[in-house]
């Protein structure tokens, strides 16, 4: 994602390059922000009998943000507050921006800390390839798409064993069916790298049918996806997704509960006196309670703390949701 941040004016100029960039723009935009960009809308000049579709540059005050992960769609709805001088009758009307890769959008932040904005931009700027992880054993294969957003398990493929075959031929049809799916995903998602992970013998056999970097680990299938993410192979990904911080949280819950704050009230209290060293916050909570969330995060940055924004639809996200949407590791 290409971007320029004017901290003084609180303006971010963004050009999304990949579909996953839309998620980070979704995190950036809140109700009340001003979003500007080129768009096309129906326009009927005064005296004209019929309207026509006209390209124009607009600014809207944001009222609603709609992000659909599986459709890779981001729509921003609001009221027009800025428009080209020669265009009349548009200001005050409602408009929807469709934000897509390759099209510039300008966001003027009206609330929250610039440090939080910078954190979101840093997350978006992580140089990670698009990885298709094929986690496989002799019973199941799981295909997971790994990007700066984390891991999305796209397909699970059970091995439909043909009892009439023996030895390696028992797995041949299974490997071929998995490879067919792999080639389809590579085409649709523009994959940079395929990683084949699982028990050594299975990975060696599968590698004759599925081309990719081989990683030996104890498990395949869905369990193997999570084993892969916990491994040291993609430490930068683990850091950005908050997996390292969450691992520390789990250890401290077991041994030093007084150095952990769980839920909004505990975290607020800790943040107010500068105790919060690291905060993990759910992306959905930031959208459900934006004023509350931005106030907490601003205080965290003002006291030198770190923030990790975690997707709810991940293993860590589900745990944080159960703990009250936000957790903190404390200094003392």
Swiss-Prot record:
Protein's UniProt name: Protein pelota homolog
Keywords of this entry: Cytoplasm, Endonuclease, Hydrolase, Metal-binding, Nuclease
Enzyme class: hydrolase
Gene field: pelA
Subunit structure: Monomer.
InterPro entries: eFR1_2_sf, eRF1_1_Pelota, eRF1_3, Pelota/DOM34_N, Pelota_arc, Ribosomal_eL30-like_sf, Transl-rel_pelota
One term of GO molecular function: endonuclease activity
Domain notes: The N-terminal domain has the RNA-binding Sm fold. It harbors the endoribonuclease activity.
């Amino acid at each position: 994602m290409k971007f320029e941040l004017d901290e003084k004016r609180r303006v971010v100029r963004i050009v999304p390059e990949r579909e996953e960039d839309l998620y980070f723009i979704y995190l950036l935009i809140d109700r009340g922000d001003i979003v500007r960009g080129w768009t096309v809308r129906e326009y009927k000049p005064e005296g004209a009998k019929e309207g026509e579709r006209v390209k124009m540059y607009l600014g809207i005050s944001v009222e609603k943000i709609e992000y659909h992960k599986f459709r890779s769609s981001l729509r921003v709805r609001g009221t027009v507050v800025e428009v080209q001088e020669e265009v009349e009758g548009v200001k005050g009307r409602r408009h929807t921006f469709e934000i897509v890769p390759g099209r510039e959008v300008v966001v003027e932040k009206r609330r929250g800390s610039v440090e939080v904005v910078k954190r979101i931009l840093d997350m978006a700027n992580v140089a990670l390839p698009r990885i298709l992880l094929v986690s496989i054993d002799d019973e199941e294969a799981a295909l997971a798409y790994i990007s700066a957003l984390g891991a999305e398990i796209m397909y699970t493929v059970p091995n439909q064993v043909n009892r009439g075959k023996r030895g390696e031929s028992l797995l041949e049809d299974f490997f071929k069916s998995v490879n067919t799916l792999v080639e389809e995903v590579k085409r649709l998602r523009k994959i940079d790298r395929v990683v084949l992970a699982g028990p050594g013998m299975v990975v060696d056999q599968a590698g004759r049918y599925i081309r990719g970097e081989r990683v030996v680990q104890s498990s395949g299938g869905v369990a193997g996806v999570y084993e892969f993410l916990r491994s040291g192979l993609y430490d930068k990904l683990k850091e950005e997704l908050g997996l390292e911080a969450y691992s520390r949280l789990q250890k401290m819950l077991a041994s030093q509960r007084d150095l952990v704050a769980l839920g909004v009230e505990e975290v607020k209290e800790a943040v107010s006196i500068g105790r919060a060293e690291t905060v993990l916050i759910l992306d959905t909570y930031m959208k459900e309670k934006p004023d509350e969330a931005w106030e907490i995060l601003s205080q965290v940055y003002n006291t030198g703390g770190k923030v990790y924004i975690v997707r709810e639809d991940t293993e860590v996200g589900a745990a944080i949701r159960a703990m009250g949407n936000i957790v903190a590791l404390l200094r003392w």
